[in-house]
Amino acid sequence: MHFQEIRRAAAQGTISLPPPANSEGLEDLAVLKSCLKVIRELSGFRYAFAKDAMAETFAPLMASVEAKNELERQGLKVSLKSYFLSLILKDLENPDILLIDNYINALFNSANEAANGPITVQTVVNVVNSFPQDGINWRENPQTDEEQILLQPDTFPDSKAVQVELARWEKYSKELRDLDPLVHALLTNLYFMAISPLNRHNGRVTQILLQLSLMGQNINSPAPCLMLGRALMTNAHFGIEERLYGLRTRQWSPYLQYMLKTLSKAILLSGELLASLQRLYAQTEAYLKMIGLASHAAFLPVIFKHPACRTGEFSSIFTTRRQVASHILNDLARAGILERVEDGRDRVFYHTRLIELLESENYSFSPLPASIDPFVPLYQKGTPGR
């Protein structure tokens, strides 16, 4: 998004704030056509999402991909396999792994609020407080120790100037007037970027706020899991100078067209990722039935929700004996669905195709085996302890 350049231009007074509050001279035909295109694409994605019984499981997985993409856009290299392992070990010491977890929490902790109202200062506070280890505070506030909840819900910045900027931004966010909802969301996001009210990580927070604003009642994105990070990386060829020139002269169309194109790309990528997850689930279910393990298909939702799993966690989820849980996981490993890895005195079972799909550039996964050597499953439906 070239956040630094936009912030610098705003500081130099070359971006006129606040943005327009009505459509006069703002929404030209090209912008309106792009808005209609994006809304149609988002409607299609929302329908595909709504009719999928696994949507609640897939949404956090998709959000983990978005978090990974966004962090890699910032120059960090993170592994989702390591992240999923850290979740079951309850070991989030690695700062990059912790950042993925915080990013996902920031998206989902504010999702319900975002779906029912405008983005506000309270939303900013909720997002920032999802990253306690980063020491984020209001711009120009005294520095405090890290590992604290730095922004209280009813506390505005110490700086009067930042207070005024935030109050004006929130007022703009709440007043839709006759703007197209997408245009309003994008300009509200640009406005936040331009004032940069935080002492650090304004770019990351801006990105999350955009995800949340797209869930608003007038746009209705189904979950905060659009692939915005990757879309921004692939659309970076659109020159910042062209965008800034338009903003300097209050010609907003170049910037809006760029962001609408980015949203369109993000929705396309999100649809592809969702379709790949659906395809892997359906193929895995069909494969289990083909090899005589139809009863094991009932456990697929768990191994999709927990791509790294141990016997203890699996046993707790199904309220069953560890021996039964071990039988199920080992059957799935022998069938080639899971990969069993020794981890000290315990074993970790990885859903390798799912992790491969989430980490690949084109959301692909290795084909399931055409056949396997027959074996007698350790778990049979009706096993004592179930």
Regions found by a protein language model. Give the residues of each.
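FIC/Doc superfamily catalytic core
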Residues: M1-R386
